[in-house]
Regions:
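A residue-identity detector for tryptophan
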Residues: 5, 29, 52, 254, ...
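Acidic, aromatic-enriched beta-alpha/helix-loop junctions
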Residues: 129-141, 145-146, 259-273
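C-terminal catalytic region of ATP-dependent kinase domains
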Residues: 1-130, 136-142, 148, 154-163, ...
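Flexible, surface-exposed loop regions and adjacent strand-edge segments
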Residues: 310-318
Length: 319
């Protein structure tokens, strides 16, 4: 009856969900959960399952009713765990038409993103996206403008803890820093060198390039972070059998392939002598520009010394 890990339960829709479930916030999810729970009464569930053919109901009817009731009762826990997985890093997608993207640093913990459609003459039309992000739920927002000449305006009087990436398109975009006191430092801009970046006083960071890859959007980019257990066994004539284990933890990040970081920790101990070794290996992608970083820490405590003295007259002590 239990859904052990709801983000994994929705594995097959992991790309779809990160395209079409980017606007609802925590309050929207909580409202929808309550609506579903109020609608799925015990009577409604029982009435639906009781319509099954008798031979089918006899096999799984009661179990299905109990499972549905249990999942309804626990829907808040399952759904909010899934929401938190989706909300951690959010893609805000424009279209191949002109848009105005407003990024407002409301406070150090809140950022509001609003997307307006622009007419061919540049007049502001209807809102096509509006969401206020909180730092408790969201660590990073990635805004993709795509084609046509888009405008991005950053405003607010305080730097937010929510990081924002603006990824423009192949046409001439405009990015304006309307903040006070350099409050756009949480924003990074990725676009062509033809992009207009407002004034020289802009406080956001920019990475401009004529390489078309700078504007790339990969709808299948999402990967789950993975924690794997490791086991190990070995043997040598001095210490005998070594047994041990550890873990490997892989984290993924934006435009970091094949991963952002990978940590591997192993520990082994000799059953007979008590000798042990501990090894940590870390790999980090694109730490500085295109430069990667690797780190290795190896700790050993041997219990056997095979040094018997200098020269050819030394005696081999078997013990």
């Amino acid at each position: 009856d239990e859904v052990r890990w709801s983000p994994g339960f929705n594995f097959n829709a992991r790309f779809f969900d990160r395209i079409f479930l980017t606007e609802p916030d925590r309050g929207d999810w909580e409202s929808m959960i309550k609506l579903i729970q109020d609608s799925l009464t015990d009577e409604a569930i029982e009435r639906a399952i009781n319509q099954w053919p008798e031979n089918v109901y006899a096999q799984t009817g009661e179990k299905t009713i109990n499972t549905l009731k249990a999942r309804r009762d626990n829907l808040t826990d399952y759904s909010m765990e899934f929401y938190e997985s989706l909300a951690k890093r959010v893609n805000v997608l424009g279209t191949d038409k002109k848009e105005l993207f407003l990024i407002q640093n409301l406070s150090k913990d809140k950022v509001r993103v609003t997307v307006h459609k622009l007419s061919k003459k540049g007049n502001i039309e209807q809102v096509i996206y509006d969401r206020t992000f909180t730092s408790n739920d969201t660590k990073e927002i990635r805004i993709y403008g795509f084609d046509e000449e888009d405008q991005f305006k950053i405003s607010g009087d305080v730097k937010s803890k929510v990081n924002v990436r603006i990824i423009g398109g192949k046409d001439k975009d405009e990015v304006f820093d309307l903040t006070a006191n350099g409050s756009a430092k949480n924003v990074k801009v990725y676009d062509r060198k033809s992009t207009k970046l407002g004034t020289s006083a802009s406080s956001f960071k920019s990475r401009l390039s004529n390489n078309p890859d700078i504007n790339n959007y990969n709808k299948n980019e999402f990967k789950y972070d993975v924690l794997l257990p490791l086991v190990n066994g070995s043997y040598n004539r001095d210490d005998g059998v070594f047994l041990g284990g550890g873990f490997m933890y892989t984290q993924h990040g934006w435009r970091k392939e094949p991963f952002a970081s990978r940590h591997r920790l192993m520990a082994n101990v000799a059953v007979a002598t008590g000798a042990f070794n501990i090894e940590y290996k870390g790999d980090f992608t694109n730490v500085i520009g295109q430069w990667n970083l690797g780190a290795v820490i190896d700790i050993k405590k041997p219990e056997v010394n095979n040094f018997f003295g200098l020269g050819n007259e030394s005696f081999y002590d078997v013990d």
